[in-house]
Amino acid sequence: MAENWKNCFEEELICPICLHVFVEPVQLPCKHNFCRGCIGEAWAKDSGLVRCPECNQAYNQKPGLEKNLKLTNIVEKFNALHVEKPPAALHCVFCRRGPPLPAQKVCLRCEAPCCQSHVQTHLQQPSTARGHLLVEADDVRAWSCPQHNAYRLYHCEAEQVAVCQYCCYYSGAHQGHSVCDVEIRRNEIRKMLMKQQDRLEEREQDIEDQLYKLESDKRLVEEKVNQLKEEVRLQYEKLHQLLDEDLRQTVEVLDKAQAKFCSENAAQALHLGERMQEAKKLLGSLQLLFDKTEDVSFMKNTKSVKILMDRTQTCTSSSLSPTKIGHLNSKLFLNEVAKKEKQLRKMLEGPFSTPVPFLQSVPLYPCGVSSSGAEKRKHSTAFPEASFLETSSGPVGGQYGAAGTASGEGQSGQPLGPCSSTQHLVALPGGAQPVHSSPVFPPSQYPNGSAAQQPMLPQYGGRKILVCSVDNCYCSSVANHGGHQPYPRSGHFPWTVPSQEYSHPLPPTPSVPQSLPSLAVRDWLDASQQPGHQDFYRVYGQPSTKHYVTS
């Protein structure tokens, strides 16, 4: 009731501008109150007409801001009610020697404060409730119910808040709601958050893988497109070569025609030159004979005149052969070239007939794998060397892939049967159905391995077993022998069963490594290469609270 009264009273003391309790309240002529700083800033932002922010009444000039003394006194008294008293200092109840030290932790169930040095002492004390629940001493006030002055040890599922027992069961605000112990609910929330975290990490990894695939595919397509561009350029260079060859042949036709014409022209010139030499020779003889006619003695013998006249008559009576001149019909020749140009232009001017989409995005359907992404990431954490988990195309896969087909302990002469994934082969006797979905090989294939080091687990009936190269677990070479169920996969290793679930007594910690069935594949390799004693309880390089069976 008092809390409701305070809330109602506080609503009347809130500034309409800053929505906080008044600070130096002033009153306008319209009787509305504001903080002096708030109304000053509001009027400073609006350089135009001055108005009241609440009733919107306009003023011709800025009115005087009078301090509301009555409201100021009420605000001061209200603020005095909300001044929290400093909490009393808590001291450790376990300190017996000297003055008690200030408490660092407070157990909400036992209501016992303790210092840092006595935290373990308090945890060892018997608790009648569900166990001790320690919080920081500074957070005790936050864990206290302001209405009932009791610690909030329950969690209301409806309101999603921590409540005390009086709020839940004794006519409280949360009566009838589903409640749970706050520690139990905290563990449930932690498990739920861890599960969601694993899912989100798996989704993040999947998205990262998709992005990597997209980036890789982008680079691959860019390389292919660049290669295609080069091939297209070579094709067009061939087209240019064809055009150059056609141009060469066309020019060669012109050159041949010109050479033929020049040959005919030279023959005509040679023939006319011979006729000219003959005419010049006769003309010279005729001129010489004409000079002799000046003397009358010439007439003594005129036979030479008759002979010369006959020759001259023969030379002048024969007609000259008609001269052949060149006639170049360039239009006819250019028409033939224009026909080729038109055909080529018609072929090239048309739109490029792109074939059926030669580059498109197609969905990538992931192939089914035998283990989930979380299991593979868990395995990759144990084995950070990515090359060790490569398939048969990798260095290790090639080394042990061949060993899987050779005759060895537990798989000699056995046919290979396909597993659930198309990437693995498992050795099976007599073509039986596969009991494991990954490649397997005997531990003797490891460095410094021998037949004496073949692992023998009691729950497998003393049978020789193989080691899975992907899941890092044991599997038998016999399919469902003796009615046994398929052997556990990673995450359910038979040699990592907690002590409360394993019925057999745990053996003492060995001082030296003997047969190493309790170690992971990577530790087998390390055990053969590193001197000294192997730490059986640090399988993956980190401390572990689980029990490991080594027999």
Swiss-Prot record:
- Sorted alphabetically, which keywords does the UniProt record give? Coiled coil, Cytoplasm, Disease variant, Immunity, Innate immunity, Metal-binding, Nucleus, Repeat, Transferase, Ubl conjugation pathway, Zinc, Zinc-finger
Q: Outcome of mutating residue 18 to A, per the record?
A: Complete loss of ubiquitination activity on MAP3K7/TAK1
For this UniProt entry, the molecular function terms from Gene Ontology, in alphabetical order, are: identical protein binding; protein homodimerization activity; transcription coactivator activity; ubiquitin protein ligase activity; zinc ion binding
Pathway per its UniProt entry is: Protein modification; protein ubiquitination
Q: Name one GO cellular component term.
A: cytoplasm
Q: Does the keyword Plastid apply?
A: no
| Zinc finger region(s), B box-type | 92-132, 140-182
What catalytic activity is recorded? S-ubiquitinyl-[E2 ubiquitin-conjugating enzyme]-L-cysteine + [acceptor protein]-L-lysine = [E2 ubiquitin-conjugating enzyme]-L-cysteine + N(6)-ubiquitinyl-[acceptor protein]-L-lysine
Query: What EC number(s) is this enzyme filed under?
Result: 2.3.2.27
Specify the residue ranges making up the RING-type zinc fingers. 15-56
Which CDD domains does this one have? Answer: Bbox1_TRIM8_C-V (cd19838), Bbox2_TRIM8_C-V (cd19763), RING-HC_TRIM8_C-V (cd16580)
Q: Name one Pfam family in it.
A: zf-RING_UBOX
Subcellular locations according to the entry: Cytoplasm; Nucleus; Nucleus, Nuclear body
Q: So which disease is it linked with?
A: Focal segmental glomerulosclerosis and neurodevelopmental syndrome: An autosomal dominant disorder characterized by global developmental delay associated with variable features of focal segmental glomerulosclerosis, a renal pathology defined by the presence of segmental sclerosis in glomeruli and resulting in proteinuria, reduced glomerular filtration rate and progressive decline in renal function. Some patients have transient proteinuria and others require renal transplant.
Q: What does this protein do?
A: E3 ubiquitin-protein ligase that participates in multiple biological processes including cell survival, differentiation, apoptosis, and in particular, the innate immune response. Participates in the activation of interferon-gamma signaling by promoting proteasomal degradation of the repressor SOCS1. Plays a positive role in the TNFalpha and IL-1beta signaling pathways. Mechanistically, induces the 'Lys-63'-linked polyubiquitination of MAP3K7/TAK1 component leading to the activation of NF-kappa-B.
**Domain description from the entry?**
The coiled coil domain is required for homodimerization.
Q: Which family does it belong to?
A: Belongs to the TRIM/RBCC family.
The name this protein carries in UniProt is E3 ubiquitin-protein ligase TRIM8
Name of the gene this protein is made from: TRIM8
